[in-house]
């Protein structure tokens, strides 16, 4: 089951998992996008879900357990990114609060709603999609970066807490050509979506599956602190105007 499965990374992973003979549930707010992602594929099922609504999450989880009891893998992929360019002045925090709700509370709530069911299934896994910006933040997107840093930390704790019962995996994307923000799908310096999805699947098919799915393009961010270059990396991705 993949949240945010109607577009971008979620859609690309759904297609590849389906093509490997998996039954896939794609979930998200926009039914039209979900239907397009399903594209008439027999084993892709569409379930609407507003990940920001706790009541909907409860109802959704109950429906998954009832109608798709063999569900054993949850991809917490839904996320939003909004820029916050002026932190030096008092501002409306609705965008920041929306990102916290979608990017952090959403995965926590949905994992909580399904954890007991997943623990009862063989081969169970929770896969959280964070971001390289959780390791070195983009100054113009501080709350987005912070939510992904928090999701990484939560994933580490969840992995330890569920060891032996549910495998917990973190996918750490670099910049990928998706519609996460307007125009991102045209950014030539970002990784092509198809290439990223293919690389992710190659990691997921390894035995054992790595705890973190790290394509080459994200290592610059993921390993910055451990390699003693956090400050220079922060400056590189956040150049100061002249």
Tell me the role of every PLM-derived stretch.
Residues 111, 147:
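Active-site helix of classical SDR
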Residues 4-8:
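Conserved glycine-rich cofactor-binding loop
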Residues 58, 81-97, 140-143:
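Conserved mid-core segment of classical short-chain dehydrogenase/reductases
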Residues 131:
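Residue(s) in the substrate-gating loop at a strand-loop-helix junction
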Residues 48-59, 93:
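The beta1-alpha1 cofactor-binding region of Rossmann-like NAD(H)/NADP(H)-dependent oxidoreductases
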Residues 20-36:
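Conserved glycine-rich Rossmann-like NAD(P)H-binding loop of the short-chain dehydrogenase/reductase
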Residues 170-171, 182-228:
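C-terminal helical subdomain
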């Amino acid at each position: 089951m993949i949240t945010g499965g109607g577009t971008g990374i979620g859609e690309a992973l759904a297609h590849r998992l389906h093509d490997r003979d998996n039954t896939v549930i794609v979930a998200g707010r926009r039914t039209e996008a979900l239907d397009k992602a399903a594209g008439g594929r027999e084993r892709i099922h569409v379930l609407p879900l507003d990940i920001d609504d706790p009541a909907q999450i409860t109802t959704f989880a109950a429906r998954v357990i009832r109608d798709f009891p063999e569900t054993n893998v949850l991809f917490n992929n839904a996320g939003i990114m909004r820029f916050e360019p002026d932190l030096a002045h008092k501002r409306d925090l609705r965008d920041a609060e929306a990102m916290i709700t979608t990017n952090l509370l959403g995965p926590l709530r949905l994992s909580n709603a399904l954890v007991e069911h997943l623990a009862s299934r063989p081969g169970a896994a929770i896969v959280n999609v964070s971001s390289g910006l959780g390791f070195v933040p983009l100054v113009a997107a501080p709350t987005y970066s912070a939510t992904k840093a928090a999701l990484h930390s939560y994933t580490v704790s969840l992995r330890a807490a569920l060891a032996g019962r549910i495998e917990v995996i973190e996918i750490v994307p670099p910049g990928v050509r998706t519609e996460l923000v307007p125009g991102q799908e045209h950014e030539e310096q970002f990784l092509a979506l198809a290439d990223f999805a293919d690389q992710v699947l190659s990691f997921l098919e390894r035995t054992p599956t790595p705890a973190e799915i790290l394509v080459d393009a994200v290592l610059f961010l993921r390993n910055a602190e451990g390699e003693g270059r956090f400050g220079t990396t922060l400056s590189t991705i956040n150049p100061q105007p002249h």
